[in-house]
UniProtKB/Swiss-Prot annotation:
The gene is lipA. Its cofactor is [4Fe-4S] cluster. [4Fe-4S] cluster 1 binds at residues 61, 66, 72, 300. It comes from Rhodopseudomonas palustris (strain TIE-1). The lineage of its organism: Bacteria, Pseudomonadati, Pseudomonadota, Alphaproteobacteria, Hyphomicrobiales. It is found in: Cytoplasm. GO terms for cellular component: cytoplasm. It comes from the Bacteria. This is Lipoyl synthase. Keywords: 4Fe-4S, Cytoplasm, Iron, Iron-sulfur, Metal-binding, S-adenosyl-L-methionine, Transferase.
Length: 319
């Protein structure tokens, strides 16, 4: 049997994606010239990695194999992934380890706050694995982490990228009550691709989640993103834009899907930079306050700079 070994853990024999091991290889086309990243070798990268490891934390930058890790960590920007490194879902696009997670670490909020202080982060992004095994999906842990960072770093703005809290009544309200500055929940793809790409989620549940955030606290910026290159059609991407605007989402990100391993969903095509520029123009015309659309766009990439632009755009629209 083919086993996908863990390339993040120090244990090289632990299967990272056991549910994908028996799948046939899915071959993607060769990457075009515009998909290029620099190897992470700088001093800043090493310092960031040291602080992350010193505090026993996980980052989505490493676990998901983000192509922008070298650039972000060189600037001491890291996205902390809370509630462990093991996800209860098995999405076809994602490189995060899957399986049954362990118990939550009650000290993790304090560790995140301390790492935020050491890195000197002015804008922090916190994400998590899905924790369908928990009664509240991890909502209380999210809220505790936000509060810990607020106490340790009162001037740091906080952006969260959450799971969908599917069938977790009251969970969203707990997270929103902690008052993050930005609430991000990614749709990931168009509705027609959910069964093959994101089978554990429900598209319109995610739309409703984002809409509910605005109902609970209109001052919180909302954000969502999708990947392209998974077999979607252009008109479907435009429909996603309309659905997000109907939920009053402020910020849209669109990036190129890149295949983590041959056992993951294949890249169906590489969307050109001109097509991304067209999506960005259209999204602004539909009313988003902020749009980032490019081959290398990821949810947390340039998040701090984008937050400043987001605030400025809201202020300008209010005048």
């Amino acid at each position: 049997m083919v086993v996908l070994v863990d390339t993040v853990s120090a244990n090289p024999v632990r299967p990272r994606h056991p549910e994908k091991a028996a799948r046939p290889d899915a071959l993607s086309p060769k990457k075009p010239d515009w998909i290029r990243v620099r190897a992470p070798t700088t001093r800043g990268y090493g310092e960031t990695r040291g602080i992350v490891k010193e505090n026993g934390l996980h980052t989505v930058c490493e676990e998901a194999g983000c192509p922008n890790i070298g650039e972000c960590w060189d600037k001491k920007h890291a996205t902390f992934m809370i509630m462990g490194d093991t996800c209860t879902r098995a999405c076809a696009f994602c490189n995060v380890k899957t399986g049954m997670p362990g118990a939550l670490d009650a000290n993790e909020p304090a560790y995140v706050a301390e790492a935020t202080r050491k890195l000197g982060l002015q804008h922090l992004v916190i994400t998590s694995v899905d924790r369908d095994d928990l009664a509240d999906g991890g909502a209380a842990h999210f809220a505790a982490t936000i509060r810990a960072v607020r106490e340790a770093c009162p001037t740091t703005t906080i952006e969260i990228l959450t799971p969908d809290f599917l069938r977790k009544d009251g969970a969203l309200e707990v997270v929103v009550a902690a008052k993050p500055d930005v609430f991000n929940h990614n749709l990931e793809t168009v509705p027609s691709r959910y069964l093959s790409v994101r089978p554990g989620a429900r598209y319109f549940h995610s739309i409703r989640l984002l809409q509910r955030v605005k109902e609970l606290d209109p001052s919180i910026f909302t954000k969502s993103g999708i990947m392209v290159g998974l077999g979607e059609e252009r008109h479907e991407v435009l429909q996603v834009m309309d659905d997000l605007r109907s939920a009053e989402v402020d910020f849209l990100t669109i990036g190129q899907y890149l295949q983590p391993t041959r056992k993951h969903h294949a890249v169906m095509r590489y969307v050109t930079p001109d097509e991304f520029a067209g999506y960005q123009t259209t999204a602004y015309a539909k009313g988003f306050l902020m749009v980032s659309a490019s081959p290398m766009t990821r949810s947390s990439h340039h998040a701090g700079d984008d937050f400043a632009k987001l605030k400025a755009a809201r202020a300008a629209r209010a005048r």
